[in-house]
From Swiss-Prot:
Magnesium is required for nucleotidyltransferase activity. CTP binds at residues 8, 11, 91, 149, 152. Residues 238-339 form the HD domain. This is Multifunctional CCA protein. Belongs to the tRNA nucleotidyltransferase/poly(A) polymerase family. Bacterial CCA-adding enzyme type 1 subfamily.
Length: 419
């Protein structure tokens, strides 16, 4: 029985990045031996155990063979006769197929990877030095989720490139229809993780390069090559603009709902009639409609979907909010449900700021609309609605008339703001 540190911890340490989680591989052991040592079994599809003290995961060495379509269509063989190299061979990328014997890892989890101690049969360390994402073996093609994982790693390690042979293999998989077999839960899991990486645009660039974006998110894929007015968008291309917007959301450390809203906000520009280009009148409404199909397809959580819809529908009005009178400003707040959900409205404004700054030459410009609308909301929300409602009732108002009285009071308060 021999234990190794494997995967991301080694990769990140070799890159000089912080190491958080440790994944362990056990070669030459049975489930019974692990249980006898106090390890707790937790794996459903293959033998994985929790350490009795640290609660870190220890997996028995295994091989996998594709035996049926789908995410779970694998035959797993885990036994003491599976070697370290056989286990590493089933992994997706060479940079994730490196191992270090546990005796070189301190009790505090610290370790210094030394070339003489590393098990690196697929030259992952060399690929780290050359900044390459390369598949381990041709078995990569058996799991189409790996297309998404490669794209996600490209977003995390944004100075890495995908090895030409790996990109070619990914293209073959897409052309063979492998991307069509991806289950919604896994697609959303990888997309959401990719959006939260350092440079999310790299994920979509890789997916586009291999053809998977046209399969998974055709609404996004068709934005490339669609022009916008150069006066407002010096980058011109809608696809280029979208990538700048989601990278701005990462730069501003936005939450996942905000980043997804940024990804969805301009979908309608891909359906503008060619004769109307480069203008995109009404694209906000079309964007809000198109994102429903995306969210249904990949089972996007409701709260993330709802924020994206508000941003898609209202971002143009928010950009132009400096031109709006008090009544129009209050109606904008009402449409955004800002009085009931002020925190979500702040997220809406952050997504709009990412949109405004995700343009060539506008990256560092201020976005005064955000602070102004927050001030407008604070003023309108400060209206004593219960007192206004009582006064309206005493004057004989009922039902919708009470709501109209509250609306008028908010408009009056906003109209009194300076500037």
């Amino acid at each position: 029985m021999k234990t190794y540190l494997v995967g991301g911890a080694l990769r990140d340490r070799l890159l000089g990045r912080p190491v958080s989680d440790h994944d362990w591989l056990v070669v030459g052991a049975t489930p019974e031996e692990m249980a006898a040592r106090g390890y707790l079994p937790v794996g459903r599809d293959f033998p994985v155990f929790l350490h009795p003290q640290t609660r870190e995961e220890y997996a028995l060495a295994r091989t996998e063979r594709k035996s049926a379509p789908g995410y779970r269509g694998f035959t797993v063989h885990a036994s003491p006769d599976v070697t370290l190299e056989q286990d590493l061979a089933r992994r997706d990328l060479t940079v994730n197929a490196i191992a270090l014997p546990a005796e070189f890892v301190g009790t505090d989890g610290r370790f210094e990877p030394d070339a003489g101690k590393l098990a690196d049969p697929f030259h992952g360390r060399r690929d780290l030095e050359h900044k390459l994402l390369r598949h381990v073996t041709d078995a990569f093609r058996e799991d189409p989720v790996r297309i998404l994982r490669v794209a996600r790693f490209a977003a995390r390690f944004d100075d890495f490139s995908v090895a030409p042979e790996t990109m070619a293999l990914m293209r073959e998989m897409v052309q063979a229809g492998e991307a069509d077999a991806l289950v919604p839960e896994r697609v959303w899991q990888e997309l959401s993780r990719g959006l939260m990486e350092t440079r999310p645009s790299r994920m979509f660039e890789v997916l586009r390069a291999c053809g998977a974006l046209a399969v998974l998110l055709p609404e996004v894929d068709r934005l490339w090559g669609v022009p916008q007015p150069e006066a407002h968008h010096p980058e011109v291309d809608c696809g280029v603009h979208l990538m700048m917007v989601i990278d701005t959301s990462a730069k501003l450390q936005a939450s996942l709902p905000v980043r997804f809203a940024c990804l969805m906000h301009d979908l309608g520009k891909g359906t503008t009639e060619p004769g109307l280009l480069p203008r995109h009148i009404g694209h906000e409404k079309r964007s809000a409609e198109l994102l429903h199909a995306v969210c249904d397809r990949w089972r996007v959580p409701v709260e993330i979907r709802e924020l994206a819809e508000v941003v898609a529908r209202e971002h143009g009005n928010i950009h132009r909010s400096g031109e709006l009178a008090a009544a129009a400003l209050v109606r904008l707040l009402e449409r955004c449900d800002a009085f009931r959900k002020p925190a979500r409205f702040a997220d809406v404004l952050l997504a709009c700021e990412c949109d405004a700054r995700g343009r060539l030459g506008f990256e560092d410009r201020p976005y005064p609309q955000r602070e102004r609308l927050l001030a407008v909301l604070a003023t309108a929300a400060g209206v004593p609605t219960e007192a206004v409602a009582r006064a309206a009732q005493q004057s004989g108002a009922a039902g919708p008339q009470i709501g109209e009285a509250i609306h008028r009071a908010r408009v009056e308060a906003v109209a009194a703001l300076p500037g």
